[in-house]
C-alpha cells in the first residue's frame, strides 16, 4: 500500500520474523555466540529467556543457520504436549522412523539416530519453544533425555526457550536435578533508545529505502519510549506510522504521526474502556467494517474514511 509512496521494495516492519531483516544488537550477538559455542562444545542443557517480542524466534533462526550443517535440530513448537507427544514431535522433526509399539522403542530409535549422527560428525539438538508452559513432569522427562551420552560426550543438546516465567519455574525445588545440569542461562534484554533507532534505520535500509530520515529523530525517540524497546512492538508501531503517513500524504514521519498510530492501536488515553464497552458503538463499528468490505474500498481512501469514522466513535 505505502511501498511506492515511500520508495520501498518491501515492507520493512512485518511482524512475522524474517531472517533477511535480522538485526542483532550486542545483547543478541552475545546470546547467539554463547548458544552456538555451547552446542559445538556439547554442553548439554541450555536456557534462553526473554519477554514476548524481544526477538527469540528471530535469534533461533540465526542459531540454526550458524550451526551450518554441524547439527540436526528438532524444533518443538507445541510445549503444551505431554512428554510422549513431545517425543513423537521430536522424532517427526528428525525424520526418525517411529515404532508404534512402545515409548521405550521410540527412545531406542532416537538413541540409534543420535549415535549415527555423531559418527557422521553431527550433534543432535532439541529446541523447545515457549518452554514456560511445560509442566514439571515433562521437564523432568526431558532432563532424562540428557542421559543419552557416549563415554566422552553428550549425544543430545537441549535448548529450552521461553518467557521470564521459565526462569522462575526452573528454580523450583522439585527441579533441582535439572538445575544442576543447566550449563548456560542467557536472556535477551529490551533494546535501548539508541538501539531502537539503529533497528529502525537498519530495517528501512534492508527494505530498500533511499531516505533513511523517513522517521524523524523525535519520532524514533517516541517509538523507543512507547515500545519499551520490544522489537515486535517497534515493528507494529512503525508499520502503523507508515500507513497513517501514507493516508495523510506525509513524506516524513513526525511525532504527531506516531501519536496517531499509538491512538489507533490503543485508543485515546482514558477512553479505551468506554469505547469498547458501548454496545451501540460496537454495532456501528461492525456495520462500518462490513460496509467497507462490501464496497471494496481500498488504499488511502479506505484509511482516511476509517480514521474519520473512528474519530466519530471516540467523541
Q: For the regions a protein language model found, what residue spans apply to each?
A:
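Conserved alpha-helical scaffold flanking the Walker A/P-loop in AAA+ ATPase domains
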Residues: 34-38, 104-123
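Helix-loop-helix "sensor" segment of P-loop NTPases
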Residues: 96-97, 116-121, 125, 150, ...
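Structural recognition of the conserved hydrophobic beta-strand(s) that form the central parallel beta-sheet
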Residues: 49, 125-129, 157-163
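Walker A/P-loop nucleotide-binding motif
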Residues: 41-62, 79
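C-terminal alpha-helical "lid" subdomain
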Residues: 210, 216-315
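A short, basic N-terminal segment
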Residues: 1-41, 300-315
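Conserved NTP-binding/hydrolysis module of P-loop NTPases
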Residues: 10-11, 70-72, 81-100
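Conserved P-loop NTPase "ATPase switch" module shared by AAA+ and STAND
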Residues: 20, 114-138, 142
Amino acid at each position: 500500500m505505502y511501498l511506492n509512496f515511500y520508495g520501498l521494495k518491501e515492507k520493512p516492519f512485518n511482524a512475522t520474523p524474517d531472517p533477511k531483516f535480522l538485526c542483532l544488537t550486542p545483547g543478541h550477538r552475545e546470546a547467539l555466540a554463547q548458544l552456538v559455542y555451547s552446542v559445538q562444545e556439547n554442553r548439554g542443557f541450555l536456557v534462553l529467556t526473554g519477554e514476548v517480542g524481544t526477538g527469540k524466534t528471530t535469534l533461533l533462526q540465526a542459531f540454526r543457520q550458524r550451526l551450518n550443517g554441524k547439527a540436526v535440530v528438532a524444533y518443538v513448537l507445541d510445549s503444551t504436549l505431554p512428554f510422549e507427544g513431545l517425543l513423537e514431535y521430536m522424532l517427526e522433526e528428525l525424520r526418525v522412523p517411529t515404532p508404534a509399539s512402545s515409548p521405550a522403542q521410540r527412545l531406542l530409535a532416537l538413541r540409534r539416530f543420535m549415535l549415527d549422527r555423531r559418527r557422521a560428525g553431527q550433534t543432535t539438538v532439541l529446541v523447545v519453544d515457549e518452554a514456560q508452559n511445560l509442566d514439571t513432569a515433562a521437564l523432568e522427562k526431558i532432563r532424562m533425555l540428557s542421559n543419552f551420552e557416549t563415554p566422552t560426550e553428550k549425544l543430545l543438546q537441549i535448548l529450552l526457550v521461553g518467557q521470564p516465567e521459565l526462569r522462575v519455574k526452573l528454580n523450583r525445588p522439585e527441579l533441582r536435578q535439572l538445575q544442576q545440569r543447566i550449563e548456560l542461562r542467557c536472556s535477551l534484554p529490551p533494546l535501548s533508545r539508541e538501539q531502537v533507532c539503529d533497528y529502525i534505520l537498519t530495517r528501512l535500509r534492508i527494505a530498500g529505502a533511499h531516505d533513511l530520515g523517513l522517521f524523524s529523530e523525535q519520532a524514533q525517540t517516541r517509538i523507543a519510549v512507547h515500545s519499551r524497546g520490544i522489537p515486535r512492538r517497534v515493528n507494529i508501531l512503525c508499520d502503523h506510522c507508515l500507513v497513517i503517513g501514507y493516508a495523510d500524504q506525509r513524506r516524513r514521519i513526525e511525532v504527531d504521526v506516531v501519536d496517531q498510530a499509538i491512538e489507533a492501536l490503543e485508543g485515546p488515553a482514558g477512553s479505551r474502556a468506554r469505547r469498547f464497552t458501548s454496545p451501540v458503538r460496537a454495532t456501528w463499528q461492525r456495520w462500518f467494517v462490513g460496509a467497507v468490505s462490501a464496497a471494496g474500498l481500498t488504499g488511502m481512501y479506505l484509511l482516511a474514511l476509517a480514521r474519520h469514522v473512528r474519530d466519530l466513535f471516540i467523541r
